[in-house]
C-alpha cells in the first residue's frame, strides 16, 4: 500500500463517517479504529502517515509484533480479538490503550486477578452478543447491565469504559440495525455508570452503526 492509496481510502472512509455522524448531530463525535490484522507493519506506518492513529489487533502475538516494529510512532493500540486466559499476562505487558473484547465476568475476574498481581490497570469494553449468534463472543443483552455492574464492583483494576458489539452477520439490514439498537439501548443505561464508548460497526456496516449511535 502506498501513501496515495492509503490517503484516498482513508479520506473516503472519513467522508462516510462524517456524513453518518452529522445526520445524528454535529456534536456526535466518532472515533475510527483501523483493524490491522490483515495489514503489515509497513501498511500501518503508511496509514499513520496518511493520518490514522488508532489501530486494532485480534491476536496478542500480532499486536506485540506490530507494537515492537512501530515503537517510534505515537499509535493507539486496541485489542479486539477473543482473549484466551493463557495470553492475559502477555497482553497486560503490552499495555494496550483499550481491550474491546471483555466477553464474560469470568474473563474479567481472571484479568483483574492478574492485573492486581502486576499492580496495573487496563481500560476495557464489555462485549455484548446482541445478535444472539453462537459464533460470536460476548454476554447476552438481558444480562449485560448486571454483568457490567458486577465488573465495576468486583474488578477494581479494570477501568470499564463502555460496550462493544459486532452487528448481526446477515444480509437483512433491518436485523443488523436491531442488533445495533439493542447495544445502544444497553449503552444508554450504562452512561450513568461511566460508559463513554459504544463501539459498533465494521467496514461493511459502520454507517448503519453510527446511525444507531456508535461513537
Model-derived segments and spans:
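Conserved alpha/beta-domain cores
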Residues: 1-204, 212
